[in-house]
Design a protein with these regions (language model features):
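Flexible gly/pro-rich beta->alpha loop and the following alpha-helix that scaffold active-site loops
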Residues: 4-7, 12-78, 83-89, 182-193
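Structural motif
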Residues: 48-50, 164, 323
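Glycine/threonine-rich flexible loop motifs
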Residues: 53-63, 175, 332-338
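Glycine/serine-rich phosphate-binding loop and adjoining beta1-alpha1 elements at the start
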Residues: 170-198
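ATP/NTP-dependent adenylation/nucleotidyl-transfer catalytic domains that generate, transfer
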Residues: 188-192, 196-625
Length: 625
């Protein structure tokens, strides 16, 4: 039996990322429930307790088999797992005086030697996402490292083989994270026993096992995940047993369906069809404003269209399975693990899909993988970079980038929170910028809520907006220093209950004043989608021509119903850098590129304002819905 590291999933958005990191380092790892029987730990060399959305003092917390702490196996607790370890040995945990979301500076105690930090410098950047904190250590534990607001950021009890960390070393934004995991595996006396060739073979064998003698119908959005799933299915089963279905749902980018078809044919994929169902999908989201309801309507419509295609092609349902290019983050953010909290419902995790899963009628070959792993698999299959490295484009397409609103004024509850958000923002001191920038800076709140994720919980709050000095013709000063913007953004979201995102205003129609802007009635209609397509295409064309497209993970253009009139809109540029989707940093372009993009967007007569999103994940998700 293969030696393993077991990750106990307390519901963290990053639980499977821990297992993935160990696998990438060459160590086989598995996910298990915290309530697991001790038999699960047979041949286990080490145990990691993940983070989670609960407070240890909530009435409803994940069930935990405390006997696990009696095992003579090394344990590493992360965030919520940090608290479980400390409480298990008599420590005290309560609400932290200051929550930490995003970057923090870890300082190691020079008087304490730790095998976990062997070969790691005494000052490190780490990634935090917590609201609770350890106030006194468990028996036998010593403090290994601290941050400005967290005195027990890293602890150990070597005699018990126990370690606990407040920060998330599983995310790339903790650069020393892989080294910490490598050191933990070394402490566990774990030998390397896993590689990407093994992963590919496991997936192909799994497809053959799950499909049995049936054929497979796959939703093809044209994005990386569905494309590589298509290649995997063709490789495992042969093109004669696989049919790709690309649905033009009316939410595609400019010329997207045409470009997807040409790309597939170029690389030898002939077993796919295109179904134009744009009117059906537009009807499904008509009048909807709630982002969750919109996503669910889109997911259910995919199933409905699939059923009509099956009927039209006379496919015997007893002979066919449905396949999806679902990633593990889709499952996590939809609350699809036992202890996780729903951040947003993905279209491939709505009830209709869940029903098919329960009946064993769906194959999801890459559901245990993250985006960077999927791209590695695609390259191993011989796919071209134009397919493997293109920006993600999920099934719902641009529909989730069109924010919707049914009223021209905020509700009483929203108005109250909006005013509280503005009051909070006014009280936050931003001293990151030079005197010239600080003198002209204006702080405001945009009255359009967006989705975020903080401490493993979904948030739905307002964005803060920073405006620098005007430079004529409606354009505003663009700060050069990305780090100062990031620091200001973190200061705002870490200090606020009502703000989860920060943007800077780059352009405002010079004929308009601030008081001309109001929340407008706006829905996901063809007219708004066409406007968004034009703006989005300008950005993407400029990213390609400047070679910036390949330097970032994804760019989203967001359409806000915040303008001077109903047929106009404001737009947000949202470029991000990420490896695994679970965390991200906003990308920052050269000033010349931003100015070129802005000048082209400003020439469109329906554009009232343009903003740039300077928020990392957490506290914000990639998209606003």
């Amino acid at each position: 039996m293969r030696s393993k590291i077991v990750v106990l999933d307390f519901g963290s958005q990053y639980a499977h990322l821990i297992a993935k990191r160990f696998r990438m380092l060459g160590y086989y790892s598995e996910i298990a429930l915290p309530s697991s029987d001790l038999s699960v730990f047979e041949n286990c060399r080490g145990i990691v307790f993940s983070g989670g959305p609960s407070s240890v003092y909530d009435e409803k917390v994940p069930e935990f088999n405390s006997q696990i702490l009696n095992l003579d196996i090394p344990v590493l607790g992360l965030c919520y797992g940090h608290y479980i370890v400390q409480l298990g040995y008599g420590g005290k945990v309560s609400k932290a005086d200051v929550g930490e979301f995003g970057f923090a500076e870890l300082k190691l105690n020079p008087d304490v030697k730790s095998p976990l930090f062997e070969g790691i410098d005494c000052v490190q950047q780490v990634w935090m996402s917590h609201q609770d904190g350890v106030f006194s250590l468990g028996e036998g534990f010593e403090a290994v490292g601290s941050t400005k607001d967290c005195p027990f950021a890293a602890t150990q009890n070597l005699s018990k083989k126990r370690f606990s960390l407040q920060f998330h070393c599983e995310v790339k934004d903790t650069p020393c994270g892989d080294k910490i995991f490598e050191n933990f595996a070394k402490f566990c006396k774990m030998e390397k026993n896993w590689d990407q060739d093994t992963v590919l073979q496991v997936i192909l064998d799994g497809i053959k096992k799950d499909a049995k003698d049936k054929k497979v119908l796959l939703f093809l959005s044209g994005g990386v995940d569905s494309t590589i799933t298509f290649a995997l299915l063709n490789n495992a089963l042969g093109q004669e047993r696989v049919l790709g279905l690309h649905i033009d749902n009316g939410f595609m980018r400019k010329n997207e369906s045409k470009n997807v078809s040409e790309a597939y044919k170029k690389f030898g994929f002939n077993n796919f069809i295109v179904e134009d169902a744009s009117n059906v999908f537009l009807d499904a989201v008509k009048g909807l404003t709630d982002p969750q309801k919109k996503r669910m309507a889109i997911g259910e419509t995919f199933i409905s269209v699939r059923n009509k295609v099956v009927e039209k092609l006379n496919l015997n349902e007893d002979d066919w399975l449905l396949a999806q290019g679902t990633l593990y983050p889709d499952i996590i953010e939809s609350g699809g693990t036992k202890n996780s909290n729903t951040i947003k419902t993905h279209h491939n995790r709505v009830q209709g899909i869940q029903n098919l899963i329960e009946k064993g009628l769906i194959i999801e070959p890459i559901k245990e993988l993250y985006k960077d792993e999927v791209r590695t698999i695609g390259k191993k299959l011989g796919l071209d970079d134009s397919l493997v490295m293109r920006h993600p484009f999920p099934g719902p397409g641009l529909s989730i980038n069109v924010l919707c609103n049914s009223e021209k004024a905020l509700s009483e509850k929203d108005e109250k929170e909006f005013l509280s958000a503005q009051k909070e923002l006014d009280s936050i001191v931003l001293d990151q910028f030079c005197e010239n920038c600080s003198k002209f800076i204006k702080k405001s709140v945009i009255p359009c809520r967006s989705v975020g994720v903080q401490g493993d919980f979904r948030t739905y709050r307002f964005p803060a907006c920073l405006t620098f000095r005007p430079e004529g013709k409606g354009f505003f000063h663009i700060p050069k220093n990305r780090e100062k913007l990031e620091s200001a953004s973190s200061s705002i979201t870490n200090s606020s209950k009502f703000l989860n995102r920060t943007v800077i205003k780059l352009y405002q129609n010079p004929l308009l004043k601030d008081e001309d802007f109001h929340l407008q009635r706006g829905f996901c209609t063809k007219d708004r989608l066409d406007q968004l397509r034009e703006v989005d295409n300008i950005v993407l064309q400029n990213l390609h021509s400047s070679s910036w497209y390949d330097k970032i993970f994804q760019h989203l253009t967001i359409d806000l119903p915040y303008a001077a009139s109903e047929n106009h809109a404001s737009f947000v540029l949202r470029p991000v850098c990420s490896e695994d989707v679970m965390t991200a940093r906003f990308a920052w372009f050269p000033k010349e590129l931003i100015e070129k993009i802005l000048s082209e967007i400003a020439s469109l007569d329906f554009v009232d304002a343009v903003y740039f999103d300077i928020t990392n994940k957490p506290p914000a998700t990639f998209g606003w819905e």
